[in-house]
């Protein structure tokens, strides 16, 4: 039986028209397409008309043609190959359905000339209705590829409609990102300054200063920050949100049963609070059997294990109630199932339930790795992470949990697959819950700074992503993958990228002052990043005419906002 390492059975696509530069394709940046997950009776027609590859099979319900996954694993149809070019990004889309079975995973796989399989995206397909499958590939070398459908069911029969592969240069992709950023991260604000009789105040001057950005690019910290004043100064001058790498974890705070020690975590939290830095909790429990306190796996009695686990949840969540922005309640509970094996299938869901009762206002994450990174293994795919969150929220008493998805983002030292990453974020975002990238890093490699910038911009340009935390720091911090500064706190190339993005994603302090006129043009309108602002209105000729107020610019207020200021004079 032919398979690849993950055990999925493959079915090769017969490429009917290999280089047709027209046809229907899905725009990976379209807001209407990005979160589309419903199953439809007939695939909708897209306004996009340019695709490198375009074909359909089995569009009609009564057709006998479909992609059949042969039980013997043999490939029964030869293919003409598609030529891909290094430096381009290829976005794949197809509407798929099952002719037999229901709710099975269907994915797209690219096989390169050297026999490597690149997982390109996946969905849960259904019978008798169509689901949109999206993904793609960013080739690290030029060459030809074969395109496959994959399924976890060897008997699957897959119908495909409007299969498309669309090519973007990196410049075109970034232009799309920038256009989307203008829509999802900014709003245009128009100021109207009038007297009480509603006549305009000509010559008024409006000054604007951002006090808090809506989107936060943060950085993890560890205990070494308590030992280095330079590390503390470096951190506080840059970041407004953090998480602690190990200091809140169970194996750190209770190394011996019954002997809790929160000294390091408390001290780090105090530093953060003194410097206006928000803290994201990591982690209450960890479902990996190898990541427990050394004494926990020695407990054989399930009742005893339940007691110490509940004590841990109560202890850490009560201690930090109201002090954190979020919690990884059961870390990596798609990859691992230690507590489920020991305490029952609903262990994770019940722990989220208890956590919700202890701190109902904190955001609670399902936090996983290899979800957006496009690794070979397929344990915590976007579909499975989405299903885990749905399972937790469906547990009795959990419907009002403030849920969120944590995509860790431990990328390999190679060109990231941005097309796959965007499709993965689409799948996760279809839940309607916020997504955070929580542990972004990458081993040292040539072009690390380029790849990290591409990853962070991809996340920032996706509407479902609400924040990012990188696992990085200066040399003294011990972060040996993403090292942002040397021992003298001089930036590395990757450090320069982070500083550039911090400046770009926080409203510049050099916002031009607005001078009110009686014209009908947009001189009084300014494009502002979402966030909190202090606004001052004054007049150069009327010294007593001055007023200040706070303003929050939000996505919910729309693309254009009007702020009316009435002057008593």
Curated annotation (Swiss-Prot):
The keyword Ribosomal protein does not apply. Keywords: Carbohydrate metabolism, Glycoprotein, Glycosidase, Hydrolase, Polysaccharide degradation, Signal, Xylan degradation. Residues 1-25 form the signal peptide. One of its GO terms (molecular function) is endo-1,4-beta-xylanase activity. Its EC number is 3.2.1.8. It catalyses: Endohydrolysis of (1->4)-beta-D-xylosidic linkages in xylans. This is Endo-1,4-beta-xylanase 5. It comes from Arabidopsis thaliana (Mouse-ear cress).
């Amino acid at each position: 039986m032919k398979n690849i390492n993950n055990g999925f059975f493959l079915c090769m696509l017969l490429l009917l028209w290999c280089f047709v530069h027209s046809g229907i394709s899905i725009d990976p940046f379209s807001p209407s397409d990005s979160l589309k997950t419903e199953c439809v009776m007939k695939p909708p027609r897209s306004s996009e008309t340019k695709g490198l590859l375009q074909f359909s099979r089995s569009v009609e319900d009564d057709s006998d043609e479909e992609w059949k996954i042969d039980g013997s694993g043999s490939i029964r149809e030869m293919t003409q190959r598609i030529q891909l070019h290094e430096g381009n990004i290829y976005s794949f889309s197809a509407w798929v359905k099952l002719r037999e079975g229901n709710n099975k995973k269907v994915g797209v796989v690219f096989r390169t000339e050297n026999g490597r399989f690149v997982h390109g995206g996946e969905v849960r397909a259904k019978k008798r209705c169509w689901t949109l499958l999206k993904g793609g590939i960013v080739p690290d070398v030029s060459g030809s590829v074969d395109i496959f459908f994959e399924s976890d069911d060897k008997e699957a029969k897959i119908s495909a409609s409007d299969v498309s592969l669309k090519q973007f240069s990196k410049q075109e992709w970034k232009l799309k990102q920038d256009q989307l950023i203008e829509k999802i991260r900014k709003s245009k604000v128009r100021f109207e300054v009038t007297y009480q009789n509603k006549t305009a105040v000509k010559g008024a001057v409006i000054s604007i200063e951002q006090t808090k950005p809506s989107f936060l690019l943060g950085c993890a910290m560890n205990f070494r920050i308590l030992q280095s004043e330079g590390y503390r100064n470096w951190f506080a001058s840059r970041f407004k949100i953090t998480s602690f790498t190990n200091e809140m974890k169970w194996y750190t705070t209770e190394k011996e049963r019954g002997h809790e020690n929160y000294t390091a975590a408390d001290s780090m939290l105090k530093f953060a609070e003194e410097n206006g830095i928000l803290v994201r909790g990591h982690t209450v429990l960890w479902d990996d059997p190898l990541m427990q306190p050394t004494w926990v796996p020695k407990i054989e009695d399930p009742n005893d294990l339940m007691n110490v686990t509940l004590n841990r949840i109560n202890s850490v969540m009560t201690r930090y109630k109201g002090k954190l922005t979020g919690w990884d309640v059961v870390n990596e509970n798609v990859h691992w199932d230690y507590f489920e094996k020991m305490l029952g299938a609903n262990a994770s869901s019940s722990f989220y339930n208890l956590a919700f009762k202890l701190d109902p206002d904190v955001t609670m994450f399902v936090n996983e790795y290899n979800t957006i990174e496009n690794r070979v293994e397929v344990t915590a795919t976007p579909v499975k992470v989405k299903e885990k969150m749905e399972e937790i929220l469906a547990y009795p008493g959990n419907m009002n949990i403030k849920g969120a998805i944590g995509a860790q983002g431990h990328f390999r030292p190679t060109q990231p697959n941005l097309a796959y990453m965007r499709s993965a974020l689409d799948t996760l975002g279809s839940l309607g819950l916020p997504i955070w990238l929580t542990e972004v890093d990458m081993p040292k490699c040539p072009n690390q700074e380029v790849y990290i910038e591409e990853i962070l911009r991809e996340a920032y340009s996706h509407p479902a992503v609400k924040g990012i935390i990188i696992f990085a720091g200066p040399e003294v911090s011990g972060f040996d993958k993403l090292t942002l500064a040397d021992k003298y706190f001089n930036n590395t190339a990757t450090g320069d990228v982070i500083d550039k993005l911090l400046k770009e994603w926080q409203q510049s302090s050099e916002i031009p002052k607005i001078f009110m006129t009686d014209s009908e043009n947009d001189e009084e309108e300014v494009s502002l990043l979402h966030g909190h602002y202090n606004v001052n209105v004054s007049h150069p000729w009327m010294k007593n005419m001055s007023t200040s107020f706070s303003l929050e610019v939000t996505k919910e207020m729309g693309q254009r906002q009007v702020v009316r200021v009435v002057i008593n004079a």
